[in-house]
A protein has these predicted regions:
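Intrinsic structural disorder/low-complexity segments
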Residues: 9-13, 204
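C-terminal segment of classical bacterial N-terminal signal peptides
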Residues: 14-23
Length: 223
């Protein structure tokens, strides 16, 4: 009997040594979705697609990243069409930095600001992060272009800095913050424009304060 137990234990030990250590570790989820998939400990970089995530600093780096209509569905009591976020951030994420590198970073499609939804009854947000303090930064001269049906950027508090350029166009409110909007740093440029399909919408709206630092520029256009 003892020999059978010993044999069983030895067999079990051998089996455990054959199991990869990765399989034993639980996959960590970070609450940020890109290209319709959540960023996890096993999926936090794609050199081919041009993005990388650092979980230690909660920084998502975009390197000439381009995305059109691959988004994460947003739960909403809305029956006219389905809503999606091209970059979607869960409400559990309180702080996120998006670092932009290169001049060819695009979210959305040039047709989106001139229509209510696509022919498939889908409407897109650019960066959807309603409970998140969002910072957009990058190297000098980096450009992020966002063209969407719904808000190009929606977040809690928004900071754009460090000489990046953000160009955003949507059919309604282009940039919406549930708190403050801060634009700072010499050479930082924000071009926000609404096509005004939804009448009376602001290009940039904050429930808190709007601060534009010395040397930074914000341009807000309608139509």
């Amino acid at each position: 009997m003892k020999s059978l137990i010993l044999c069983f234990l030895l067999t079990l030990c051998v089996m455990l040594t054959l199991v990869p250590s990765v399989a034993l570790a639980a996959e960590e989820r970070y609450g940020v979705w890109i290209l319709d998939e959540e960023i996890t400990s096993s999926r936090k970089i794609s050199r081919k697609e041009g993005w990388e995530f650092d979980p230690n600093t909660y920084t998502l780096t975009l390197r000439n990243f381009q995305i059109g209509t691959i988004g994460t569905k947003i739960s909403a009591l809305f029956d006219k069409y389905s809503l999606f976020g091209l970059i979607y951030v869960d409400t559990s994420v309180h702080d996120l930095t998006i670092r932009v590198e290169g001049r060819e970073n695009y979210l959305g499609d040039e047709a989106f600001p001139y229509e209510n939804c696509t022919k498939y009854k889908e409407a897109y947000y650019g960066i959807y992060a309603t409970n998140t303090n969002l910072t957009i930064t990058g190297n000098r001269g980096a450009i992020l272009k966002i063209q969407t049906h719904e808000n190009a950027i929606e977040c809690k508090n928004l900071t754009i800095k460090d000489s990046v350029t953000v160009e955003a166009v949507s059919q309604g409110t282009c940039i919406y913050s549930g708190g403050d909007i801060t634009i700072e740093g010499v050479g930082t440029i924000v071009n926000a424009r609404t096509t005004d399909i939804i009448k009376g919408q602001a290009t940039m709206s904050a429930r808190g304060k709007l601060y534009v630092g010395e040397g930074a520029l914000d341009h807000m256009f309608r139509g």
